[in-house]
Amino acid sequence: MSENYTPRLKTRYRSEIRETLNKEFEYANVMQIPGVTKVVVNMGVGDAARDSKLINGALNDLTLITGQKPQIRRAKKAIANFKLREGMPIGARVTLRGDRMWEFLDRLLTVALPRIRDFRGLSDKQFDGHGNYTFGLSEQSMFYELDVDKIDRPRGMNITVVTSATNNEEGRALLRELGFPFKK
């Protein structure tokens, strides 16, 4: 990326969305206007406890989707019923901030979500009380970065959008303005 490049969604947030949110909630200070802090993409691979090669596919998929190397998540304690030992890899996580975060959100909203079959919108009840939003995707094939023929198995993922909003209403308004397709 060149030095003077600004992601499209970030430009829209700075020019239009901040003003809209300020009019809607009438903040005393412009620093109170909520924004997106980070996006965390988590992919749990429970089967990796039995077959250690499965984690590599998840790492490759997450790298292609996010453009960043994932962090391997390991089991904190052993659970005999799941044949799980402490320290075994059971997932992968990527935390996106800055321009990569804005690019990922733009691709997610404009390309990936519309490609989901029978997609009727995201639930607007999955906020955590502090304006952060988490939703799950059942498979990774809707991302155009992945070659559908090279996907070895469908893997779901959780995506958490962390905002600086103080409550759910502010977070919901911010994400709706950004273009999140919530159900009516």
From Swiss-Prot:
GO terms of molecular function: rRNA binding; structural constituent of ribosome; tRNA binding
Swiss-Prot/TrEMBL GO biological process terms: translation
UniProtKB keywords: Ribonucleoprotein, Ribosomal protein, RNA-binding, rRNA-binding, tRNA-binding
SUPFAM superfamilies: RL5-like
Keyword flag rRNA-binding: yes
Disulfide bonds: none
One GO CC term on file: ribosome
Family: Belongs to the universal ribosomal protein uL5 family.
UniProt cross-references to PANTHER family, sorted A to Z: 60S RIBOSOMAL PROTEIN L11-RELATED
Assembly with partners or alone: Part of the 50S ribosomal subunit; part of the 5S rRNA/L5/L18/L25 subcomplex. Contacts the 5S rRNA and the P site tRNA. Forms a bridge to the 30S subunit in the 70S ribosome.
Its job: This is one of the proteins that bind and probably mediate the attachment of the 5S RNA into the large ribosomal subunit, where it forms part of the central protuberance. In the 70S ribosome it contacts protein S13 of the 30S subunit (bridge B1b), connecting the 2 subunits; this bridge is implicated in subunit movement. Contacts the P site tRNA; the 5S rRNA and some of its associated proteins might help stabilize positioning of ribosome-bound tRNAs.
Protein name from the UniProt record: Large ribosomal subunit protein uL5
Organism of origin: Corynebacterium kroppenstedtii (strain DSM 44385 / JCM 11950 / CIP 105744 / CCUG 35717)
Taxonomic placement: Bacteria, Bacillati, Actinomycetota, Actinomycetes, Mycobacteriales
Gene symbol of the encoding locus: rplE
